């Protein structure tokens, strides 16, 4: 059985509240779970103690049993000091898009054309 430690959404529309659960990866997101390990309330301020609550002993037990945390839960565990911080690489994140590259090329060509006659006139 492939285990995951993940978020199960609760709360009402536009008012999310999540339970941190250990569940079988084949079960639905909000469906059956094996154990509730904590809660996460994204509506609270980031510095609030009640924003993320976890039973770290049980989390470590499930990690020892081979449960894989999802990306968001892994970040929570890194912040709590349970898991080592994974290095993330978004190499394409900062790269400009296709249209921006084309605009930059056109701008560079225009500037080169504008500077070329001025340089020739200055050298004569």
Swiss-Prot record:
For this chain's UniProt record, which GO biological process terms are given? Answer: translation
Annotated Gene Ontology MF terms? structural constituent of ribosome
Quote the biased-composition stretches of kind Low complexity, using this chain's numbering: 111-124
**Chain segments annotated as coiled-coil in the UniProt record:** none
Q: Which UniProt keywords are listed?
A: Ribonucleoprotein, Ribosomal protein
Recorded hits in Pfam families, A to Z, give: Ribosomal_S16
Q: Where is the composition biased (Basic and acidic residues)?
A: 84-110
Listed GO cellular component terms?
cytoplasm; small ribosomal subunit
Segments for region (Disordered):
84-124
Q: Which family does it belong to?
A: Belongs to the bacterial ribosomal protein bS16 family.
PANTHER family (alphabetical): 30S RIBOSOMAL PROTEIN S16 (PTHR12919), SMALL RIBOSOMAL SUBUNIT PROTEIN BS16M (PTHR12919:SF20)
Q: What is this protein called?
A: Small ribosomal subunit protein bS16
The protein's gene is named rpsP
